Amino acid sequence: MSASAVSRLGWYARRAAQMSPAEVAWRVRDQVVRAAWSPRQVTREQLARTAYGTPARDLTFTAVLPPGTAAQVPAEARRRVLEAADRLLRGEWETLGVLRTDLERPDWFRDPVTGLRSDPDKYAFRVDHRSQEKVGNVKQVWELSRLHHLTLLATAWFLSQDERYARRVADHLRSWWRENPFLSGVHWTSGIELGIRLISLAWIRRLLADWPGVADLFERDALAVRQIRWHQRYLAAFPSRGSSANNHVIAEAAGQLVASCAFPWFRESERWRRNSALLLERELIRNTFPSGIGRELASDYQCFVAELGFAAAVEAEASGHPLSQVTWDRLGAMADSAAAMLDERLRPPRQGDSDEGCGLLLDAPAANRWPSLLALADVLVGRLDWWPRPAADAGSVIAGAFAGRRHQVASRPGQRPSRFADAGVTLLRTSGENEIWCRCDGGPHGYLSIAAHAHADALSVEVRYAGIDILADPGTYCYHGEREWRSYFRSTIAHNTAELDGQSQSSERGPFMWARHAQAREVEVIDDGDIARWTAEHSGYASLDPPATHRRSVLLDRASRSLDIIDEIEGRHQVRLAFHFGPEVHVELDESTAALSWPQPGTPGAARLELPGVLRWSLHRGETDPILGWYSPGLGRRVPAFTLLGRGHCVPGAPLATRLEFLEIGRPSKPVLSWGISDARVCQAPEIRAEA
């Protein structure tokens, strides 16, 4: 047996250990069904021998936009869409940080990162999409086939009536139809991809409704009709379930619902619509806390799930089959929590995994999709007085016009919340310009037994000044192919928290699998105006000898514009305390004091970080052996950034005190507030070692 086969068997064994007996039984049955479906595969050779022609019966598309919608799009938003569309006509498009220049005639199977091309004729359920050696970087391959570039081109046609955009959409779609027949190749291996693709197809047809060639591209083309049915048959037959029912099941249900409403052309359409609506409503509630925070505790996926939920809800409403008030209430909570978490630059937290997934693209791509989400939510559920005010964009105007009305949602906060107790997320922040923004993590590890998109980041903090990352969450960087990097970016030492005895708080069993979950709880959250204080603890080190509990308190003094961080650890253990900085921050270390500086308009930013003197501190940047000192601005990208690492031993009753003070010219430092706890001199620093 090959090494890869042995590794694969090991993965299956570890994965099965995270499942219930019922899920194991269902997955066995699912594998049997997948094998039994192999005769249903349609190859490209078979497709070439088949003359599909036109459908046997007349089909119509009625889910169109109201007259005058295009004229409502702001001029600046229109300009951005057309500029991006013109670049696309030249073959230029960025996918997950990679600028592609080959999109005049795209190769749907080629990975632009590795240059590898997966087998387009292989039966989908025999494609090992997790193997970078066989398919390349599968996220790159999948991303293009979500067809977001075609929804953008369709939007450009809708706003300009320029024939070039519509013709390019038609060329690419017909290419995709031909190159990706049913169950052939990598684009039929994951239901989330099919769900997103169906949403894109519905909106492409809608945006091109007045283009003379659109009916020949869709309902008069038997292959196009068959592709739309194939996608829905797949989603009905192979849903995500059990410990995998995270954002994937939301995308699958949303895509099925959108397609069955927009293309009700098949005998199964009504059943697909009912089932997908029930599934979506159930899973939206399961996947989000009542506060609106996503249970995956991965900020980027909260935006993604909200986009999918709104896209499906709008489609259902327009088709005359609205979703329940409970679902709209939860979507409203998701929007309110999103509005509350953004910093003064409208940047979201960077908690957990991020793959920049997009539910629907009707605008020029942006690095930060959250302002667009709020603009859409403003149209659909209404903004509250305390919300930030992002500018209207093409997507919010167009989707809002299609929705037709604004929904009233219940139980909305009268002022901006700073604590989401059910999710263990608390924000300590100042008001006015040059905002100090601090996210504190004191909640569950992640969602479901594998917590696929969680990081080992309990009690970590993320601190920004005027929207600039100071103490930064390093991000995600990669999913497949670079296991050492994947493990690092998820690890405890990669976050602004404490690691004990060289172990992460939660134990990793695979790139999307955690075996043991550190559970954190908030002990106290107090905000009396000038002072805000947060205290939480976690049990991730209860299995050590002796058992250990890590408790952290963070105090924001708004008057002195400073943060104090106090770490208390039960049990005598080796400790590594890490502080990671954003790529804009320069750090100079002098024993246990670090001088921080960064560029900003006017006077450069500056801060002083007083570190626990009982630890031995070292400064790192862009190191690979071992990995340390990196920041990932997005999936597939990493840049060097400073990291401070303190090493030592701690015993009970010996807190580690850290103070971050933001400096302003002419303002004297304020003395450190008394915490009512003993000093930390009883910790001992170890000998200097070569390893980090």
Ranges and model annotations:
Residues P120-K122, D128-A335, A339, R347, ...:
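Aromatic-lined, polymer-binding surfaces characteristic
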Residues G195, S354, L361-P365, V379, ...:
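CBM-like, beta-strand-rich accessory domains located in the C-terminal region of large
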Residues Q256, A338, L428, D567, ...:
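A residue-level signal for conserved active-site and pocket-lining positions in enzyme catalytic cores
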